[in-house]
Amino acid sequence: MRKRVLLAVVAAAATGLTVAPLTASASSHREAPLIAEDPLADNTDLYAFVAPDDPNRTVIVANYVPFENPAGGPNFYRFGDDVAYQIHIDNRGDARDHLVFTFQFHTSTVDASTFLYNTGPIGFNNATRTYTNWNRPQTYRVTMTNADTGSSAVIGSNLLSPPDVVGDRSTGSAQNYHMLARKAEYTLPGGFKVFAGQRDDPFFANLGGVFDLLNFSGATTGAEDYLAGMNVHSIVLSVPSGMLTANGD
């Protein structure tokens, strides 16, 4: 199967960290006509910030699959098996790749006789490290490439992506879902930390007004966030900050 490649670029220079999204035929929050036909490959936003629990680490978040309505059916929201999601790091400020992280996903079907996303309340089996009653689980692998030498190494494989939020009967309360999602957090060799799964979309915008010829006059009660309550699929990569800057500066 020929994989499509989606790029998220993090450029770091000695003067500071600059972050800019760069994608192959993708744009922000589905306003570009072509990528609207391929939401699994739509890179909505890219964020980078100092880890709240460790000032020596930087968290990079690349979001995909915009406008995930929790009531819209979980079958439609996932990472694409035919997409190679990539984060490129320029840590010298020369506009060239030096480190590339590639995330590749695989979806399996537990019971092919049903179309159901889950066949009962989704739980987690600590002994087998698998989610229970989830009929469409996703796993992924992470490959790190040194673009200077051309060498690549798989730094994580058969990693779990958590199930989507379906509802109280399927994924339990918000607290229960939080515990389910935490099972999909990983620390990998080299000090990398990763998570890939559904999250609340943090982007704030009056998109209704934007698409209505920049009509913001109706916002009489203050700012309007048309993305409130919507989710995205996030690829989260935490790295030692020294990897993002020239000479560790």
Where are these regions (language model features)?
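Bacterial N-terminal signal peptides
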Residues: A8-T18
